[in-house]
């Protein structure tokens, strides 16, 4: 509303919008909304909430991203605020899913179930997310920054991230 009344600078709004996980689209008056699902994990209720968001505010399609998130296209600008509140009601956020921030922390898609994993890395990914989200240092980076956790030697994603961590257990000797 404040943007439409000229009370907010367009560049300030763009920076704020990106930090909130919202991209403008080429089409007028619609946005792309991206969630931030730490390590790609969610509950059944959260998945149902995402499905409801797609039906209510988007075009009914949940796009799965390479960072283990979902994004929704064609969300009307006037629906974004209510949609974000609906997500928050289920413990979901879009905060820092876009822009020059620490992007979603990913983990091996088999974390917690892989027979070859050294240990489940998902709790470590979630801890890093919880520490970094809304942290002053991560709000205005020169570029997006990506972190990934792998639980076994077969996890191939760690080497292609800014920080890639693979599980290891070392003896103290």
Where are the model-predicted features located?
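Acidic/polar, glycine-rich intrinsically disordered N-terminal extensions of enzymes
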Residues: 1-27, 139
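Small-residue-enriched alpha-helical segments and adjacent helix-cap loops
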Residues: 4-8, 30-172
